[in-house]
């Protein structure tokens, strides 16, 4: 990655609305079927700038694709623990605590608003 590319990634990371990401993760944990609505709300790993968020979203998407009706913190941790580098990223960012806080404190509301904010950047 060139210096210019690195600077662009850092800029994108600062612009991305982290609260919206947290609300999106809350919605997915409470209602994973939202990931099946690709026509109205297409979400991909590339929508997330930070590796930490990419790891979490990738695990959620894999769990949904494997048929999970619900997704909780233990499921996500278990999914990521199979892969050394992503699991290190997850743990270095206190992933379990981060997701527990999201699930316990953020209601899965206003998804459309947060989705639009995520897609804006």
Residue ranges of model-derived segments:
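Noncatalytic partner-interaction/assembly domains of nucleic-acid and motor enzyme complexes
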Residues: 1-121
């Amino acid at each position: 990655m060139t210096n210019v590319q690195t600077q662009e990634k850092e800029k994108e990371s600062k612009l991305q609305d982290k609260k919206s990401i947290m609300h999106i993760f809350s919605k997915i944990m409470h209602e994973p079927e939202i990931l099946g609505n690709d026509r109205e709300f297409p979400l991909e790993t590339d929508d997330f700038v930070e590796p930490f968020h990419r790891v979490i979203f990738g695990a959620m998407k894999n769990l949904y694709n494997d048929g999970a009706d619900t997704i909780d913190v233990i499921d996500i941790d278990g999914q990521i623990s199979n892969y050394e580098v992503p699991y290190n990223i997850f743990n270095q960012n206190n992933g379990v605590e981060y997701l527990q806080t999201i699930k316990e404190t953020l209601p899965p509301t206003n998804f459309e608003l947060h989705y639009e904010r995520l897609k804006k950047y």
